[in-house]
């Protein structure tokens, strides 16, 4: 090292190790609140250890990973980060419950150009809340400060979740047949899908996110966290056999419903069985979006859809309502002679 050159540090290059350590200390209590008895050790190790619950005779592990998409851009623009962590967990655990799996543990990845500890702590606190709502443990994660890769304080998040299901109880759609009833569980809003279109509609409408619509600012409608259905559905599965569950995410009705239907069957959806939450009407009107495109992009008020035997529908609806869900019969299954597996009428 020569005397006429400055001594450079990692911080000079844009990576603040002290800020990262501060974040870790601030989120330890968040992780602790999500603890499950199967978890061995705490945060900070090179790997996280978790045993399988002893109640399972032939356990199968179910894994999923997801992000929040461009809902992040809206949250960053509005500087409202509290719900993003819940969204991240919800997008993963709701995919697991589709196969009947109980979420066990969750890991997150937070990447940014310049680490803002307060913002990151809000996001991770939301992740912890999502884990509490779904009964899974936050056992680890990665915070990556990468100057030059992201603009300013912009960030991205990704989540990874592992759950477990009894091998004999896997829900895979194979039992679905004509005559099954479809019940819907209401969404809390657009959840975490379609936000590139949401942002475009905001742009062309000329509306500000602070404008009040249906009793609260548009921003609150649009940043409402994704609803987590895990505990309600696990409670249902204790009493009622379910033939299929679908999570209405990217691709809407047209793409997600066929993912759980056997060939030769179709879902017939009764459009008169529910009213879209008002934010979807606002989006359709201000973006001049066709109804077909709405069902292709958004959940339109339906977060999950469940197929089951017709004589179990009333019991299932009662159980889910007792868990605080907005639930109703939305349609049924019919035989189909073509490749069209969704009919909305």
UniProtKB/Swiss-Prot annotation:
Major enzyme class: ligase
The protein's annotated pathway: Purine metabolism; IMP biosynthesis via de novo pathway; 5-amino-1-(5-phospho-D-ribosyl)imidazole from N(2)-formyl-N(1)-(5-phospho-D-ribosyl)glycinamide: step 2/2
Record field: catalytic activity: 2-formamido-N(1)-(5-O-phospho-beta-D-ribosyl)acetamidine + ATP = 5-amino-1-(5-phospho-beta-D-ribosyl)imidazole + ADP + phosphate + H(+)
Record carries keyword Ligase: yes
UniProt keywords, alphabetically: ATP-binding, Cytoplasm, Ligase, Nucleotide-binding, Purine biosynthesis
Pfam families: AIRS, AIRS_C
Key word Cytoplasm present: yes
One Gene Ontology biological process: adenine biosynthetic process
UniProt-annotated location(s): Cytoplasm
Assigned EC number: 6.3.3.1
InterPro entries: PurM-like_C_dom (IPR010918), PurM-like_C_sf (IPR036676), PurM-like_N (IPR016188), PurM-like_N_sf (IPR036921), PurM_cligase (IPR004733)
HAMAP family linked to this entry: AIRS
PANTHER family, A to Z: TRIFUNCTIONAL PURINE BIOSYNTHETIC PROTEIN ADENOSINE-3, TRIFUNCTIONAL PURINE BIOSYNTHETIC PROTEIN ADENOSINE-3-RELATED
Protein name listed in UniProt: Phosphoribosylformylglycinamidine cyclo-ligase
Annotated source species: Pseudoalteromonas atlantica (strain T6c / ATCC BAA-1087)
Record lineage: Bacteria, Pseudomonadati, Pseudomonadota, Gammaproteobacteria, Alteromonadales
Annotated gene: purM
């Amino acid at each position: 090292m020569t005397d006429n050159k400055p001594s450079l540090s990692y911080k000079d290059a844009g990576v603040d190790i002290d800020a990262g350590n501060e974040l870790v200390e601030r989120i330890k209590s968040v992780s602790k609140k999500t603890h499950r008895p199967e978890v061995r050790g705490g945060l900070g190790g090179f790997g996280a250890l978790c045993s399988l619950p002893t109640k399972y005779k032939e356990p199968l592990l179910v894994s999923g990973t997801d992000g929040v998409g461009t809902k992040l851009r809206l949250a960053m623009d509005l500087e409202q980060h509290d719900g993003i962590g819940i969204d991240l967990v919800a997008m993963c655990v709701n995919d697991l419950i589709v196969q009947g799996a109980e979420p066990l543990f969750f890991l997150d990845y937070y990447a940014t150009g310049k680490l803002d500890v307060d913002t990151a702590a809000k996001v991770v606190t939301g992740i912890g809340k999502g884990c509490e709502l779904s009964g899974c443990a936050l056992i680890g994660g990665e915070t990556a400060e990468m100057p030059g890769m992201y603009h300013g304080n912009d960030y991205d998040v990704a989540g990874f979740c592992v759950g477990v299901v009894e091998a004999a109880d896997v829900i895979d759609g194979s039992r679905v047949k004509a005559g099954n009833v479809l019940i819907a569980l209401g969404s809390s809003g657009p959840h975490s899908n379609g936000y590139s279109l949401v942002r475009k509609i905001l742009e062309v409408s000329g509306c500000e996110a602070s404008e009040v619509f249906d009793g609260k600012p548009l921003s609150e409608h649009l940043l409402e966290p994704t609803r987590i259905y895990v505990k309600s559905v696990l409670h249902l599965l204790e009493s009622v056999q379910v033939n299929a569950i679908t999570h209405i995410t990217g691709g809407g009705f047209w793409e997600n419903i066929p993912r759980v239907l056997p060939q030769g069957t179709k879902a017939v959806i009764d459009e008169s069985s529910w009213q879209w939450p008002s934010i979807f009407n606002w989006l359709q009107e201000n973006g001049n979006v066709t109804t077909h495109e709405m069902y292709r992009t958004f959940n339109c008020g339906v977060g999950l859809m469940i197929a089951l035997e017709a004589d179990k529908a009333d019991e299932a609806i009662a159980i889910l309502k007792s868990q605080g869900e907005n639930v109703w019969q939305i349609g049924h299954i019919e035989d189909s002679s073509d490749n069209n597996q969704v009919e909305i009428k």
